[in-house]
Amino acid sequence: NGDIAHNGSAMAIGYYTNTSEAYSSNDGWTNYTTSTVGTAGSFTSGKGYQMATNGGSLVEFNGSTINTGNVTFTATTNEEGSSNANDGTKFELVANPYASYLSVTSFINAHKDTQMHANHAAVYGWDGAQYDTYSLASPGNGIAPAQGFMIGVRGSDGTSQTITFTTAMQTDSGSGDYSEYDPMEDDRAELFINLNQNDYNKETKLFFLEQGTDGLDVGYDAATMDLGNYSIYSRLVADDEGVNMDHQSLAYSEMWDKVIPLGVNALAGEQITLGISHRTTPADLNIYLEDVIEGTMTDIKAGDYTFIPSSDINGVGRFFIHMTADTMSNGEVSTSMLNAYKEINANYITLEGLATQSNNINVSLYNILGRKVLDTSLN
């Protein structure tokens, strides 16, 4: 196809491999070349591919038949145990195999409990600049015909899962690559927090639903797929194991008294703006952003919080969202986040929040027999 973009012999069409070796060499992507494309064979139904054209021109696909039955695809994870790693080894690139739109809700519901990674039981779609997250908390999404998308695969290194696209997942509604409509049913509210620095805009989404809880709600909570110099995310209110969440669902009935850890990655010396980009919470619910380092409490319904950091920011423990019926002011509350967890297969324990602690932290570690094996103080 002459409309496929080229860069020398490299063609702007290729596939994704999630091994650590492939990811370290080119973020997992392999492009066909003018010498390899001729022997590449046919597209695999259900497998995703990357593609770019000259000037955004249309690409024509030809085949003898279209899929009218169920389609299966084998997805494999090469993750070695880190639940919060963002190296791409837990993801597979799949695609809608039908000539109709595919329901994200139906797809996730069919795979979230067995085949999809518990922290990543969502659909991740590339928008040309970053990955957008679609979960059960963002209802009514449709994936365009042949559109590719990333999914997290459940299991230890080398585990394969069968992904099944069924005709029942097809829908006749949708437009564009990923269509989204939001019926905003009763007992539902949304709060999106935005980070802006150097003209980069990032967003994390909080949903308040009847089925939401403070812990992990598989399919409704979705971890971030990729992090960079500019990122914003939340942490689970309960049972936090160091996983950075892009979508977090919480109980609608409990939103009047909630403190949510907020993570920020940003660079030193450049202005940062944190604010609300979308809100459907009740008008009389106050929403404050706490900066533990500065000791400030900002009403972000009234305006954004803007500052210039003196050093790079990376992680959680400094910022918290407070949702309350009360009026709060600077110095009234000082939230402290000290979190400890161990990754699967890791031979170490991660401690978070030390930078925001004003006093020394005493750490004691016991083995399964109850014997103290470590007793130390951290400054």
Enumerate the predicted regions with their spans.
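Compositionally biased Ser/Thr/Gly- and acidic/asparagine-rich
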Residues: 1-10, 16-379
